[in-house]
Amino acid sequence: MSGNTFGNLFAVTNFGESHGPAIGCVIDGCPPGMALSEADIQGDLDRRRPGTSRHVTQRNEPDAVEILSGVYEGKTTGTPICLLIKNTDQRSKDYGNILDTFRPGHADYTYLHKYGLRDPRGGGRSSARLTAPMVAAGAVAKKWLFEKYGTTFRGCMAQIGEAMIPFESWEHVANNPFFAPVADVSNLENYMDALRKAGDSCGARIRVVASGVPVGLGEPLFDKLDADIAFAMMGINAVKGVEIGAGFASVTQRGTTHGDSLSPEGFMSNNAGGVLGGISTGQDLEVSIAIKPTSSIITPRQSIDTAGNPAEVVTKGRHDPCVGIRATPIAEAMLALVVMEHALRQRAQCGDVKVSTPDIMRSRG
């Protein structure tokens, strides 16, 4: 199987399966000399981990990360960093009824046709559990970027199913299980309770923002910053759409509205989402992703078995009624990995470039 490594200068190789003994990643390219411990990583893993509320899967994984290499006396050495997360709460018997049938919306059918066999236990390699190592790697990237440039990453739930979530404050995001930027989430709790009772699932829209991004990141033509962001976000399980800045709303905007005017104090809007010509402007990187409804639901659905005969599928097990609820730290991590990759490229290729035009975003403050 190819396609397990993300990035080049900051390369993250992901390994493991949902019900295997462990999952993890190896990071190649982290600069030496940065203080790093498990505690620097665990916080983001705790935000993503399952079993934290009744609105997500009840699989109870502590997701405790171990640093196996690449750190000596508390500092990164510049050598590969191996991060390990042990699986402790697998329940493979839940998947006994789908050994010979294909679950609608899952990768069962495509994996079998591609590889000639498949691991049905929790989806195996196609499971969203494999996002945990990427969150761990993203935490390493976040730390380096913050210490080097002051770059920060934040995300929130903007919509869950039909329920639009107005933005009130970033301060609310950590105070509820939905990562919602609102003080009162009772309507979201009622919505999810009704959905679970109906044996159904829903999708979500996640917003993620990177602030303090240096000007000049991105490599036209084919490694544009926004192109790599879209590539990274589409690599997250269940993501079916990506918007940068105004995104699809650009279709109905006019040029007099969409183009972000400049002033000595900075850009006057951010329809571009922080990227022009594939290169960062220094404004916030604004990204939204659309996540499809969870495919594993208890409502019976029609499918076929491995012999091609009609079959009815009822998915048992412990599943998220909305996988988007835990996607916020995942999207933050993937955005951080993209910015980290391009920051290292910029340092290597254009680190000596000097311009007389002021950085208007930095000069603001």
UniProtKB/Swiss-Prot annotation:
FMN binds at R125, S126, S127, N237, A238, G277, K292, P293, T294, S295, S296, R318. NADP(+) binds at R48, R54. Homotetramer. PANTHER family: CHORISMATE SYNTHASE. This is Chorismate synthase. Its cofactor is FMNH2. GO terms for biological process: amino acid biosynthetic process; aromatic amino acid family biosynthetic process; chorismate biosynthetic process. It catalyses: 5-O-(1-carboxyvinyl)-3-phosphoshikimate = chorismate + phosphate. Pathway: Metabolic intermediate biosynthesis; chorismate biosynthesis; chorismate from D-erythrose 4-phosphate and phosphoenolpyruvate: step 7/7. NCBIfam families: aroC, PRK05382.1. It comes from Polaromonas naphthalenivorans (strain CJ2).
